[in-house]
Design a protein with these regions (language model features):
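Feature detects long, helix-prone N-terminal segments enriched in hydrophobes
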Residues: 2-179
């Protein structure tokens, strides 16, 4: 019989980024769907697991889905605002959606250097309609603050990949709220 052990890893402090815009949530969601190629990427991950056999097939598949957009791929969305309807009885609560997105090529590189980071892959983003519906908040954990090696091992390649991912996500968000 094995004896389980538990370790509490003190990660560097996570940085949660929140952007605010006066854009309607429906517009933010439409732009995010476009940036992540939601229509083209919806079946992508099942195709990865079911049909792809080589790294080159994965690379080609990602490039075909990304197709010059944000460099990130849509995976899923969870409409959490619907849960508040049950609790409040409000049939039309402010919109809250959590998006999962990413790029499997980034994921491969990050996991190579820090397998524990897989707990935070794919990245997630929350889109929240303001209570008075006069704008939208977009929030996400900064990848470089939650995916570095928790044992303190500095890896320059991992750090560079995560800082690049930070910039890629920020550029996507700014493209959405400034467009």
């Amino acid at each position: 019989m094995s004896t389980p052990t538990k370790a509490v890893l003190h990660l560097p402090s996570a940085h949660f980024i929140v952007w605010e815009t006066s854009l309607p949530t429906s517009e933010v969601l439409a732009r995010l769907d476009f940036a992540l190629n939601k229509d083209g990427a919806t079946e992508f991950m099942s195709h990865v697991h079911r049909d792809m056999k080589t790294q080159q097939e994965l690379v080609d598949g990602i490039h075909s889905v990304v197709n010059g957009r944000a460099g990130l791929v849509f995976f899923s969305t969870i409409p959490l605002h619907k849960l508040t309807t049950f609790r409040t009885g409000n049939p039309n609560p402010p919109h809250i959606a959590v998006y999962s997105f990413g790029n499997p090529l980034y994921a491969q590189r990050v996991i190579k250097h820090n397998p524990i980071a897989a707990a935070n892959i794919p990245p997630r983003m929350v889109i929240i309609e303001n209570e008075n519906r006069d704008g939208t908040r977009i929030g996400y954990n900064l990848p470089s603050s939650i995916m570095m090696d928790p044992f303190g091992k500095e890896d320059e390649e991992l750090k560079a990949d995560l800082l690049s991912l930070d910039k890629k996500i920020e550029a996507m968000v700014l493209g959405i709220i400034r467009a």
